[in-house]
Regions:
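Juxtamembrane membrane-interface segments at transmembrane-helix boundaries in membrane proteins
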Residues: 1-17, 71-80, 143-161, 200-207, ...
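Extracellular TM2-ECL1-early TM3 structural module of rhodopsin-like
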Residues: 10-14, 55-109
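First transmembrane helix
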Residues: 11-39, 53, 90, 97
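Membrane-lumen (extracellular) interface motif
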Residues: 39-42, 66-75, 133-156, 228-247
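The cytoplasmic-loop to transmembrane-helix boundary for the fourth helix
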Residues: 105-129
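Extracellular-loop-to-transmembrane junctions of the mid-late helices
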Residues: 128-185, 210
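Intracellular effector-coupling site of seven-transmembrane GPCRs
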Residues: 182-228
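Seventh transmembrane helix
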Residues: 210-222, 226-230, 240-300
Length: 313
């Protein structure tokens, strides 16, 4: 269906945006909570994931919160969303750069570059947000502020968001390709070693390779329909395709949720959650069970640990 969106269609898009952004907000908040709750996660690598999740929190928050009926709040919502969404995908380049510098170039100075990372992410996001404000007006539907339609406005939006976005996608793809290629070669070399410890490490690296291969696809999944929709808006500024707008809004709103699963919910986080769950469960049993059962409940985990140790050696 082509043409201007009806009030009902705009209401549907607003609800889709709220639903997807809420999932992203919950997922990103969970990752931030894990960073503060588990001291073992407060390493530099996960610190970068923390800032990624923090950007996603504010991107999702400003996507659904505001007062579009007032011009000031409408501008605040629109530009804040733009700023933090740009910062979000820029943090993925920092993570890719850090991994490449550590694995491929064998550098250990990445923590010394933290100040430069912040200057790069927040400074670049601010520059693109300021550029977008030139000659740009805002309108709204539902609870969201949208850029005023027109070729000039669409071109500005594309230049300040989608152009750097696809530059990030290309950079991440190339960077992870180099990292994966190098670790694949190392895994093939380890496969010829009879030592079981090296074979376990090789299988671990293979799991990491499979996971890293999906990282560049997250941004593609989140923004491919948005890119197509912006191109369509530029070519046909007075026409809208509802199903394309639906996919655009829905996938973009889920970016933070995708990031929280791929970057945040890694094996280290899952292991920390599992250990916390076992501790909580065992403490609960010790409070309610009699002494005889309490002894058996404490003895069984130790046997499981010994079995795991035997399996690993």
């Amino acid at each position: 269906m082509e043409g201007l969106l009806t009030g009902k269609e705009r209401s549907i898009l607003a609800k889709v945006n709220i639903g997807g952004s809420s999932l992203s907000l919950l997922g990103s908040t969970f990752i931030v909570g894990c960073y503060f709750f588990f001291k073992d996660l407060r390493k530099f690598s996960y610190k970068l994931v923390f800032f990624l999740a923090l950007s996603d929190i504010f991107c999702s928050f400003f996507s659904v919160v505001g007062d579009p009926s007032r011009a000031f709040f409408c501008y605040t919502q629109g530009y804040s969303t733009h700023f933090f969404c740009v910062a979000s995908f820029l943090w993925t380049t920092v993570i890719a750069f850090t991994l490449h510098r550590t694995v491929v170039r064998h550098k250990t100075d990445v923590e010394d570059l933290e100040a430069m990372f912040h200057l790069y992410v927040w400074g670049t996001a601010l520059v693109f947000t300021v550029i977008r404000s030139f000659g740009n007006e805002h309108s709204h539907f539902g609870s969201s502020c949208l850029t005023q339609k027109g070729r000039t406005s669409t071109a500005i939006h594309f230049f300040t968001f989608y152009a750097p976005l696809w530059g990030v996608i290309l950079y991440n793809g190339f960077t992870y390709f180099q990292v994966i290629r190098m670790l694949s070669n190392a895994a093939r070399m380890a496969a010829g070693i009879s030592d079981r410890e090296y074979q376990v490490d090789a299988r671990t690296d293979t799991k990491a390779l499979n996971r890293w291969g999906y990282y560049p696809l997250i941004l593609i999944a989140a923004w491919a329909f948005g890119t197509i929709n912006r191109v369509h808006d530029f070519l046909y500024p007075t026409h809208k395709i509802f199903w394309l707008s639906f996919l655009d809004v829905g996938t973009a709103a889920l970016m933070g949720f995708f990031n929280s699963i791929a970057y945040g919910l890694n094996s280290t986080v899952r292991r920390a959650l599992h250990e916390r769950y076992l501790t909580f469960w065992n403490d609960g049993l010790s409070m309610w069970l009699p002494k005889s059962r309490k002894y058996r409940a404490q003895a069984q985990p130790s046997e499981m640990v010994s079995l795991r140790v035997q399996d690993q050696h």
